[in-house]
């Protein structure tokens, strides 16, 4: 799942930082990354750790926005990403990236969109919400939220 936490980590990282996160802290050279990729949960925990660093650096000076439009199961960094499988869900914002990502996942999970099953199968098969759990454990934020429609 590529929400606020992913953008805080992978999205803010240099090429060396991206390699470091994807390898679970083993390498910073992107040319040898693919021989050193971390196990999935280790990678997700490294994303949460990197997100924690950025969130703490900008604490009190950052807001998070999620535009849930044209949702695809593939990462935005894929060279050939699958076409979007879900219709537009909405735009969410929060001062807490953990709450924002949890709310986004919950909105998808509880939607009636015909693409929901495909989307959630991909999230679940990749342990996608493990980053949210790890980020909460690191103290970045909480998974508790209140949706306010405007």
Task: Describe the residue ranges of each PLM region.
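Extended, low-polarity segments enriched in aliphatic/aromatic residues
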Residues: 1-150
């Amino acid at each position: 799942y590529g929400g606020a936490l992913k953008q805080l980590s992978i999205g803010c990282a240099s090429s060396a930082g991206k390699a470091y996160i994807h390898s679970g802290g083993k390498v910073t050279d992107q040319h040898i990354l693919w021989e050193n990729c971390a196990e999935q949960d280790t990678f997700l925990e490294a994303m949460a750790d990197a997100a924690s660093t950025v969130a703490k650096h900008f604490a009190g000076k950052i807001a998070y926005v999620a535009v849930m439009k044209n949702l695809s199961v593939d990462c935005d960094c894929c060279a050939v990403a699958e076409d979007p499988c879900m219709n537009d869900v909405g735009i969410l914002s929060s001062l807490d990236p953990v709450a924002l990502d949890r709310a986004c996942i919950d909105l998808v999970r509880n939607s009636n969109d015909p693409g929901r099953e495909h989307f959630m199968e991909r999230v679940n098969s990749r342990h996608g919400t493990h980053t949210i759990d790890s980020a909460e454990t690191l103290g970045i934020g909480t998974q508790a939220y209140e949706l306010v429609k405007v």
